[in-house]
Amino acid sequence: MVKLVVGIGNPGRQYVWTRHNIGFLLLDSLASRFLGAFREAPRLYASFAKVEISSEAVVLMKPTTYVNLTGKAVLAAKKFFDVSMEDILVVADDINREFGFVRFRQDCGSGGHNGIKNTTQILQSNHYWQLRLGVGRPSYPGAEGVADYVLSSFSLNEKEKLNDFLEKGIEEIFPWLGC
């Protein structure tokens, strides 16, 4: 049996440290911890790393489709690795929660996240797991739009807390991974 962990984010160096790419950042942390190396898989519309966690085969996947088209890559990987819906986890940013908030659950809505919406639409089901990582919402006067906000870099204060936040997210999914 294989588990598929999909980080939602945008490809390209300009997006690496943006709020929308927190899913990719969490997968990078997991890959580093379990000695996985990402490689390109054009026919899966993604780069992926295979790791073993608690004797469980786990595929870490970062779609190359941009956030709003994530479902195409998830479906391709689901078919290629023959993964059941219960063994899919999608990691995404959540602007409806403050920075540092972590939520892990199954069978839930998109919360307005276009990558989650697209994944649910393409899979024709929301019966997969989600790890939502709060990145906050702009609240100061003259705040940039939501799209600009999620495509902007973390604040200095957030960067100082980012490793602990990612660790908190990883710990939240360890039971699902069998740890």
From Swiss-Prot:
UniProt catalytic activity: an N-acyl-L-alpha-aminoacyl-tRNA + H2O = an N-acyl-L-amino acid + a tRNA + H(+)
GO molecular function: peptidyl-tRNA hydrolase activity; tRNA binding
Subcellular location: Cytoplasm
Protein name: Peptidyl-tRNA hydrolase
Taxonomy, superkingdom: Bacteria
Top EC class, one word: hydrolase
UniProt keyword terms in alphabetical order: Cytoplasm, Hydrolase, RNA-binding, tRNA-binding
Catalytic residues of the enzyme: 20
GO cellular component annotations of the record: cytoplasm
Site (Discriminates between blocked and unblocked aminoacyl-tRNA): 10
One of the protein's GO biological processes: rescue of stalled ribosome
Role of this protein: Hydrolyzes ribosome-free peptidyl-tRNAs (with 1 or more amino acids incorporated), which drop off the ribosome during protein synthesis, or as a result of ribosome stalling. Catalyzes the release of premature peptidyl moieties from peptidyl-tRNA molecules trapped in stalled 50S ribosomal subunits, and thus maintains levels of free tRNAs and 50S ribosomes.
Quaternary organization: Monomer.
Keyword Heme: no
Positions contributing to tRNA binding: 15, 66, 68, 114
EC numbers: 3.1.1.29
Predominant location category: cytoplasm
Pfam family, one: Pept_tRNA_hydro
Family: Belongs to the PTH family.
